[in-house]
Amino acid sequence: MKLKTLSVGEVNNYVKKLVENDFILKNLNVKGEISNLKFHSSGHIYFSLKDENSKVNCIMFKNNAVNLDFRLEEGMKVEIKARLGVYHKEGTYQLYCENIKKAGIGELFEEFHKLKKELSEEGIFDEKYKRALPKFPKRIGIITARTGAAVRDIINVIQRRNKSLDIILYPAKVQGENAADSIIEGIRYFNNEKSVDVIILGRGGGSIEELWAFNNRDLAYEIFNSRIPTVSAVGHEVDFTISDFVSDMRAPTPSAAGELVSPSLQEMINDLLNKKEFLHRAVDRRFLNAKRDVDLLHKGLKGNNPTHIIEKRIKEVNTLEEKLNFLGKRKIDKAKDELIALNSILQTLNPLNTLGRGYSVIMDKEDKVINKVSELKKNDMVKVIMKDGSVNIDIKIINE
């Protein structure tokens, strides 16, 4: 007998009828822990119910939700009365809840608060251990997944604020089995290599189980013992993990972490100019003080005529002059060396020097810098500035 070929819709309808006609699946009592909780504006409640090994999607419609005598919370352990249904369009199944009873606080939340209390009593969260982030870092280490919104957000913010900063990514697992060990390896790598000035631990938002790697005791100790300052940027602003409490600073989002660790180029230039001005004033002050001392000695000599006093004072003046010349020369040499170093830094930060490393700048006919392809249209005339000059180019083809 040849079997009939079914459409996808026919398969889903068949499964739907099987499920809806099953007596057990129409009268289920299921216990588990709430995660991914969402209260819809329609009044419906969406969430997942999970245990150690599995999870299932659930929905409670408004007509049943209004009868709840408590508010559902993330991590809450509950027992639900429900029926299993199939969503025909997607071919997925979910539990349709008629009633929910509270069964206690979720085990993960209990474990989180227990660990937080223990580590707090050990003192590793104390403010006295928090280190200030470097004001002007040169290299920034990021420990997060190789792909995803978190790493994109951090890198985009840092490069927007200061393109001269080096960024080193340590790709790590940030969710699931062995994720905490992977993050620990990243911290050890940066500490052993001594290759960065500050470390960002980053991950996008998620449920408590998705962020659980950052609630690991061994990871907390590794962050505490890190010789390099750390910034925890895990989840959204409302999410808190153990790594937030033990790190030197917590950022509410990965993007905010990028802002915290990257001084703008203008801030760096202003700081260098202020130091240069301070050195000038210090040298001038030293010379003025020395000159005043010499003038006072000369006045004292004029008021004492005896030859031996004059000779004595002349010797003192000569000694002071020699000392002044020595100190002045040493101060000038030191100031000169510092100014040369500052000038070298300024030259490094000079955007025009970037052209010498193979980059170029594209400008429109009004000499405005073009950053995006979307700012151009066909037949536009642009000027491309390179190391040794510039060329004018007509735009013929745009690839986006």
UniProtKB/Swiss-Prot annotation:
A GO molecular-function descriptor: exodeoxyribonuclease VII activity
Coiled coil: none
GO biological process, one term: DNA catabolic process
Entry keywords, A to Z: Cytoplasm, Exonuclease, Hydrolase, Nuclease
EC number(s) from the headed UniProt entry: 3.1.11.6
Catalysed reaction equations from the record: Exonucleolytic cleavage in either 5'- to 3'- or 3'- to 5'-direction to yield nucleoside 5'-phosphates
One Pfam match: tRNA_anti_2
Keyword Cytoplasm attributed: yes
Example of a GO cellular component annotation carried by this entry: exodeoxyribonuclease VII complex
Protein localization: Cytoplasm
Protein task: Bidirectionally degrades single-stranded DNA into large acid-insoluble oligonucleotides, which are then degraded further into small acid-soluble oligonucleotides.
Subunit structure: Heterooligomer composed of large and small subunits.
Protein's name according to its UniProt entry: Exodeoxyribonuclease 7 large subunit
Source taxonomy: Bacteria, Bacillati, Bacillota, Clostridia, Eubacteriales
Gene (name only): xseA
